[in-house]
Amino acid sequence: MEKTNHSLTTQFILVGFSDHPDLKTPLFLLFSVIYLVTMVGNLGLVAVIYLEPRLHTPMYIFLGNLALMDSCCSCAITPKILENFFSVDRRISLYECMAQFYFLCLAETADCFLLAAMAYDRYVAICNPLQYHSMMSKKLSIQMSIGTFITSNLHSLIHVGCLLRLTFCKSNRIDHFFCDILPLYRLSCTDPFINELMIYIFSMPIQVFTITTVLVSYFCILLTIFKMKSKDGRGKAFSTCASHFFSVSIFYVCLLMYIRPFDEGNKDIPVAVFYTIIIPLLNPFIYSLRNKEVVNAVKKVMKTHSIFKNASASMAR
């Protein structure tokens, strides 16, 4: 199936998890369950935030958008993984590949900005509580979210445009389970210098800006917490930031491990699985299980839905 001539490649083969044919069925079932839980968890969180007026605050606006982007990330990758478990040739066209990368890049870039925005929101809430409503209003959080999507979309389009300038005439086998930028560089017959330059010009500043925002915000938060005389106040502040800090830590550790320089091969696949599939699965539970406001909102929505369901059943009788 692999191309050995120098004709231009318009289709690729996603090698993915084909090295383990004996695990095909268990892996298919595992990824199916992960995909289902991820979509239900994230879209359910978006629905709860939308339906509960008390959650229409900056923190939950950012959280809802984060859940939406995690759903986008999962939709961009997992369906193709599931299809390829039982596909004979595991092919993906060039334009399918570009579309998959576009949505992945959009989701991951937006995640970086949203996590930074959530860190800044927590900084304002803990370090400047009296000025919170003036420094972080609902209107500002909506504007920041819109700006995040516009910037992420432009960032993604820039890299897709640069990828389309490349010609692929080497092997058409992508040693990965999705179309990512670095594995595609390896297959290019065109010098990817401009593409790499775009990474340094656009992607690196985004990473530096968002990581710096998170680090500075949490440094100020920790200083404020340690200055608090009340144990209850410190406990409440730690509890407020713990879930976000845990999520941010996992996301950036995995992302930095993944984008490090690496050799030919598929050594980066386990890390890629974690940050593209596992993190979107975990996020709604990290932010919800220990959050009383979200838990109470879920109970309220379920109770309301149950009331409507019972009323409909009574009317049907």
UniProtKB/Swiss-Prot annotation:
The keyword Glycoprotein applies. The chain crosses the membrane at residues 29-49, 57-77, 94-114, 145-165, 199-219, 240-259, 269-289. It is a multi-pass membrane protein. It is found in: Cell membrane. Keywords: Cell membrane, Disulfide bond, G-protein coupled receptor, Glycoprotein, Membrane, Olfaction, Receptor, Sensory transduction, Transducer, Transmembrane, Transmembrane helix. One of its GO terms (molecular function) is G protein-coupled receptor activity. Residues 50-56, 115-144, 220-239, 290-317 are cytoplasmic. Pfam families: 7tm_4. It comes from the Eukaryota. Glycans are attached at residue 5. One of its GO terms (biological process) is G protein-coupled receptor signaling pathway. Its main location: membrane. GO terms for cellular component: membrane; plasma membrane. Disulfide bonds join 97-189. Residues 1-28, 78-93, 166-198, 260-268 are extracellular. Belongs to the G-protein coupled receptor 1 family. Potential odorant receptor. This is Olfactory receptor 5K16. It comes from Mus musculus. The gene is Or5k16.
